[in-house]
A protein has these predicted regions:
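Non-heme Fe(II)/2-oxoglutarate
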Residues: 2-65
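Amphipathic alpha-helical recognition patches that constitute DNA-binding helices
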Residues: 4, 80, 107, 173
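A structural signal for well-ordered alpha-helical scaffolds and beta->alpha junctions
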Residues: 10, 14, 45, 54-58, ...
Length: 220
């Protein structure tokens, strides 16, 4: 199951997050402790990321998904702010399904790219496997202040197609993951991220995939 929501966050708050990002000098890559880096970007980023793991938003997700014990991950394990420049591409995959003795149940993607053109690609793809082939069921343009929410399971394949924006633009998204004590639609065993249909030629075209905020930060 999946849904797209439009314009549910204040535009001025997201504008503030973009301003925080633009003022932050970042390079590829330095690892920092998960969940403790948002303060490096600015007040707007802290306010938004605190809200995304806070009680009000999580209760909204519980009511939407009917997962009554849904919990946020305040450590932001594997999640955070993603900056994806021209040449970026994320192959279809299913996610790791367990963390801290809980089952991963819901993914939330909040897009931050302004004035994104359809021909620039970077569409969020949701799909399934038929035989040996990956089939795209739905594509979402990564438009500013749009949110895509989908259940996480052993068959919830997703990724994004090749980003072809100008060099001075980036595909930008905040990813958030939510967990439950109930297994849901997962298989019997825990699993790691599982990629399918890996296109090595398109992989070579990827200039770099710059992730920061929870896992990566600027070099001092």
């Amino acid at each position: 199951a999946h849904i797209k929501l439009e314009n549910i966050f204040p535009n001025d708050l997201l504008d503030g997050v973009l301003s925080d990002i633009e003022k932050t000098e970042y390079e590829y890559f330095k690892f920092c402790t998960v969940g403790n880096c948002f303060s490096e970007f600015g007040e707007s980023t802290v306010k938004l990321t605190d809200y995304l793991v806070g009680d009000e938003w999580v209760e909204f997700l519980r009511n939407m998904t009917e997962i009554k014990d849904l919990k946020s991950d305040k450590s932001w394990h594997g999640a955070g702010i993603n900056i994806e420049p021209r040449g970026s591409h994320l192959e279809p995959h299913t996610d790791f399904n367990e963390f801290d003795h809980m089952w991963r149940r819901v993914n939330v993607l909040l897009f931050l790219s302004k004035d994104w053109k359809d021909e620039w690609g970077g569409h969020n793809e949701l799909g399934h496997i038929e035989g040996q082939n990956y089939v795209v069921d739905r594509k979402y343009k990564p438009e500013f202040n749009n949110v895509v929410i989908f259940n996480t399971s052993h068959y919830s394949y997703h990724g994004f197609d090749l980003v072809s924006c100008p060099n001075d633009k980036n595909r930008m998204v905040i990813s958030c993951y939510y967990y439950s004590n109930e297994r849901g639609e997962h298989g019997a065993a825990t699993s790691t991220t599982n990629y399918v249909g890996w296109d090595r030629e398109r992989k070579k075209q990827k200039e770099y995939y710059n992730r920061f905020g929870t896992g990566w930060r600027k070099l001092k």
